[in-house]
């Protein structure tokens, strides 16, 4: 597959140069930027291209893309972080109403060509499940630190595996906090 990327600033000239001949256009932008980007992007699509996103929530961006674009729309959510194990490369595919099996298959094929496994879901089921999983992740992380803060006598007994869990929790609560704040608000 031929890949062309666009970065900021996203100008009409950049869209006009990059999009002719594209079979699919993937928006790798914050879901909150969708409303700002779509009016500039959609006039450069001819209705046959697949418009897809890569975002952590699905209902809002999928709805925005479908309202802005009459062609096929497919939402995607890679369910892994920046340093995944090969077995962790799963991607949720959320087809829009105008997407046929051919459109969905092309998007799934792109991810499979990169070593990912895919599964399909509705946007509603995705967002409900993602909110539950991320909520549990966030709450359990808070529980670790709240418990240890009140029971320092436990610290000498922490195992290496629990220390790794604490480090992941610390990262989630400090470095990833803005992302989780946005996810909670979007769900």
Each language-model region and where it sits:
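Short gly/ser/thr-rich secondary-structure transition/capping motifs
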Residues: 6-11, 55, 73-76
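Rossmann-fold NAD(P) dinucleotide-binding segment
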Residues: 16-65
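An accessory alpha-helical subdomain
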Residues: 120-187
């Amino acid at each position: 597959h031929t890949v062309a990327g666009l970065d900021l600033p996203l100008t009409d000239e950049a869209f006009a140069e990059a999009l002719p001949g594209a079979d699919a256009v993937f928006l790798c932008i914050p879901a909150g930027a969708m409303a700002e980007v779509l009016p500039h992007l959609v006039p450069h699509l001819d209705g046959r291209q697949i418009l897809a996103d890569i975002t952590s929530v699905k209902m809002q961006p999928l709805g925005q893309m479908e309202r802005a674009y009459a062609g096929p729309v497919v939402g995607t959510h890679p369910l892994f972080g920046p340093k995944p194990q090969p077995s962790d490369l799963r991607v949720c595919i959320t087809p829009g109403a105008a997407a046929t099996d051919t459109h969905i298959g092309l998007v799934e094929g792109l991810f499979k060509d990169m070593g990912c496994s895919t599964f399909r879901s509705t946007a509603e089921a995705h967002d409900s499940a993602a909110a539950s999983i991320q909520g549990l992740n966030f709450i359990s992380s808070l529980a670790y630190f709240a418990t240890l803060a009140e029971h320092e006598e436990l610290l000498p007994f922490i195992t290496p595996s629990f220390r790794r869990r604490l480090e992941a929790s610390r990262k989630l609560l400090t470095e990833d906090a803005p992302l989780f704040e946005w996810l909670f608000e979007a769900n």
